[in-house]
Structures are given as structure tokens and as C-alpha cells.
């Protein structure tokens, strides 16, 4: 049974996130910049050269959203802003971890149709915002968990193909939209961003196809004779390996992403006020503009840099709380010291190896 505190934690994160982000967008002038750009007779991307592509699917509301999306994502992936590119790198480490964990959770029922909710939740995160949907997903996930579902593991075939689903559905579309300008035109990059936006659907689709292909391969005789306990043991070992590999990849991305920040902090990148490296200083990189500050952003790039950090922090706070509530110590009433010590330790791990590493590591501990 889920702790009663989840009824406070996740609604609070959701409402606080909505309040902070909406005030940030208004007070910083970012929302007005959006309005002015779209109202232009010939809307341009933040580089002020590339025309905004406004038709993608032929569905006006969806096309309008995808066009608005370009103002935040294009400067993150086109290499025009060092700080945004580095933030995008950190986002990749987080997305790999979070969506791997979400995919595993959807596969516990062993019903292919449960990949539909995974895809829908993922698309909701992409279209409505990580900071809004992730707290709601975590809340619903904890409310809907049952002891029987906790004990179930995905099939061996499903576990084996998860890396392919992440690679083909998420990593490859991400890499394509980040190709240099001499390989990808401004218009093509906008199409690539629109394709990437739907990566949860591509992950689910690859998972279904790959599992069906793996299932068509005849099992070895030794596997056919495996008992139920033996199958559980094999699947748990495979899931542990998946979690460990995902945690290592996420941690590696985070640690590599810290190198420019540390270099800026110790003066290796000469981060003077007018230098392009100025935003890589730890305080400038990690701390966005406060939501109630009326300092106007200088352009769409700065606005995107602020928004994407709020999005990252708020959604990840929910994911962090989610996996903490799954831990055995949370099921022991009055075990406040153990909970506090666990949270402190995991905050330290997050600073060193990134939130993706911590989230996946905690989900692995849940198997104990």
C-alpha cells in the first residue's frame, strides 16, 4: 500500500511546478517573445535566419505546437549555444534512465497492450511538459501498484530488447537532430526535431516488433526445461544487468558533462563576463533565473535555457520521490532516520553521477 504522504508530495510538486514555470515565462518576457515571433509575417528561428517550418502533419493544433517547440529545441541541438548544448547533453542522460525505468514498469504485466499507456504517458511528457506530467505519472503509478504487480518481472525476451528500443527509439533520433549544419539543413533539422518529439511512441513500437521477432526464435532446450523459480532468477539477473548498464551510461554522460563546467570553474575556459563560456560557470549553468524576477531575457535562447532547467529540476524531483517511495525503508512506519539518511546519500550520488544514475540504481535496489 502506498504511503499516505504521496497524496501531498506529488500534487505539491505539480502545483509548485506550474506556478514557478508560468510565472517565469511571464515575468522574464519569454512568453511575450513567443507571441511576437509567431505573430511575425515570416517567423524565424532564434538564429534570425532560418524560416520557421509551420506544417508537419496537416493537423493545425499539432503543427502549431511542433512549430512552437522549435524555438526551445533548435538552439539546444544546433550548436549555436554552448550552455544549451551542454544542458541537452545532460537531458539525454536523464531521458535514457527515466524512460528505461518507465518501460520496465510497463512491461511487468507481460501484456503487450500495456505499452500503449507507456507511449501515452511518454507523449504526454513530451507535449505537456516533463515538469507537469512526470509528477502525475509517478503519483498514478504508486496508487496503482499492487503487491502482485511488484513481484512480477518482464519476460526475458522483453528485457533483452529494451536496449534496442532505447537505442532506435530515443538515441538515434536524438543524434540525428544534433547533426552539424553541413550535414543537416535548417528545415531538415526542424523535421528531425518533430520526429524526435514522438520518441516514446517509437520506443514502444520497436519494443513490440523486437519482442515478436525474438519470440519467433526457437528457445534452447535448456531454457524450455527451466522451472518457474529458475525463470524468475534468470529474469531478475537480466533486469539487474539492464539497470546496471543503464546507470553506467547515464553516469558517464553526466560525468563527461561536468568536465566543461569544472573547467570553467577553475579558469581553464576563461569564463569572463563576455566570454561564450560565461554560462558554463557552475552558478550560471545550474541556477536559472528566479521565477518572480522581472529581468527580461535577452532572446529565445536565454528563455529556453531558463525553461529547460526548470523542466529538468521539477520533473526529476518527482522521479526521485517516486523511486524513493518504492524503497523498503519507506514501508516501515516511523523509520525517519533511515529515510533521511537514504535521501541524503542519494542526493550526494546525484551530484556526482547524475539523477539518472540515482533513479536507476534505486530501482535496482527494489529488486532486493
What are these model-derived regions, one by one?
Residues 1-368:
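Long, hydrophobic alpha-helical transmembrane bundles and adjoining juxtamembrane helices/loops
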Amino acid at each position: 500500500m502506498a504511503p499516505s504522504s504521496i497524496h501531498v508530495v506529488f500534487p505539491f510538486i505539480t502545483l509548485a511546478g506550474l506556478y514557478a514555470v508560468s510565472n517565469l515565462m511571464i515575468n522574464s518576457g519569454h512568453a511575450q517573445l513567443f507571441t511576437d515571433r509567431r505573430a511575425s509575417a515570416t517567423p524565424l528561428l532564434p538564429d534570425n535566419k532560418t524560416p520557421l517550418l509551420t506544417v508537419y502533419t496537416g493537423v493545425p493544433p499539432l503543427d502549431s505546437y511542433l512549430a512552437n517547440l522549435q524555438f526551445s529545441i533548435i538552439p539546444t541541438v544546433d550548436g549555436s549555444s554552448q550552455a544549451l548544448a551542454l544542458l541537452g547533453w545532460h537531458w539525454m542522460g536523464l531521458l535514457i534512465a527515466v524512460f528505461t525505468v518507465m518501460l520496465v514498469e510497463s512491461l511487468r504485466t507481460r501484456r503487450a497492450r500495456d505499452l500503449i499507456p507507456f507511449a501515452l504517458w511518454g507523449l504526454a511528457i513530451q507535449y505537456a511538459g516533463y515538469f507537469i506530467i512526470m509528477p502525475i505519472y509517478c503519483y498514478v503509478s504508486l496508487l496503482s501498484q499492487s503487491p502482485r504487480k511488484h513481484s512480477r518481472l518482464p519476460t526475458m525476451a522483453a528485457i533483452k530488447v529494451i536496449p534496442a528500443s532505447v537505442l532506435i527509439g530515443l538515441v538515434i533520433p536524438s543524434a540525428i537532430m544534433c547533426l552539424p549544419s553541413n550535414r543537416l539543413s535548417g528545415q531538415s533539422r526542424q523535421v528531425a526535431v518533430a520526429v524526435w518529439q514522438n520518441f516514446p511512441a517509437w520506443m514502444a513500437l520497436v519494443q513490440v516488433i523486437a519482442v515478436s521477432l525474438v519470440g519467433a526464435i526457437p528457445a534452447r532446450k535448456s531454457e524450455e526445461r527451466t522451472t518457474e523459480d529458475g525463470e524468475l532468477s534468470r529474469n531478475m539477473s537480466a533486469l539487474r544487468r539492464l539497470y546496471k548498464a543503464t546507470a553506467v551510461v547515464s553516469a558517464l554522460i553526466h560525468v563527461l558533462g561536468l568536465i566543461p563546467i569544472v573547467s570553467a570553474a577553475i579558469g581553464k575556459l576563461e569564463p569572463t563576463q563576455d566570454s561564450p563560456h560565461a554560462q558554463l560557470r557552475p552558478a550560471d549553468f545550474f541556477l536559472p533565473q528566479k521565477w518572480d524576477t522581472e529581468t527580461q531575457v535577452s532572446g529565445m535562447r536565454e528563455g529556453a535555457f531558463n525553461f529547460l532547467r526548470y523542466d529538468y529540476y521539477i520533473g526529476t524531483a518527482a522521479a526521485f520521490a517516486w523511486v524513493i517511495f518504492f524503497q523498503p525503508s519507506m514501508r516501515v512506519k516511523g523509520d525517519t532516520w533511515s529515510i533521511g539518511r537514504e535521501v541524503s546519500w542519494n542526493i550526494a550520488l546525484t551530484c556526482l553521477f547524475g539523477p539518472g544514475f540515482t533513479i536507476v540504481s534505486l530501482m535496482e535496489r527494489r529488486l532486493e
